[in-house]
Amino acid sequence: MGITHELDIFVTNEDLALKNVELFKGNSYGCFINLKVKEEKKFNIIFVLKPDWSEVDKVKPIRMIVNNNSVDVEKVSESLYQVVYSASFSINSDSYVKVFSDNPDKYKHMYPTVTINVPKKKFKVVDQGNTYMFIQSPIDDCDKEQFLKNEFEYYDEENDFDDYEEYVKNRNDSFDDY
């Protein structure tokens, strides 16, 4: 039947999700990203790989090159269902990013290509390659909760309880008026 991994890439500081970046079939994953910037900008990227364990017993690590410079990609967590990686880098001019598990030149015609124009807040899939890739913005709340807890602060847990107590008190006070 063939190997079918799943790969999602989250560009957290731009609130973008590159979804279904995996190939239709095959033990390779990656994409090319054209980044347009007008000033220095730091990017934080989270990769979520859901391996097809029925066909492989270990996954290839994700690697990244930005403007011909290697970027450290750190494995954050690994479970039976997924492997999560993260990477950060800064650029001060338009840049070309390669994300890959195998030689990106070999898969150039298969990996998707995306353009993200940061100043204009525009993005598009330039070439879908052999994927069903799409871009989601903003990042879905379920994905934020599951993978990006440290990147997005939803609430302050200490204040949640206080706010709830205040809500109940106000609600009960309003019932007294009737």
UniProtKB/Swiss-Prot annotation:
InterPro entries: Poxvirus_C7/F8A. Pfam families: Pox_C7_F8A. GO terms for biological process: viral process. Plays a role for multiplication of the virus in different cell types. Belongs to the poxviridae C7 protein family. This is Probable host range protein 2. It comes from Yaba-like disease virus (YLDV).
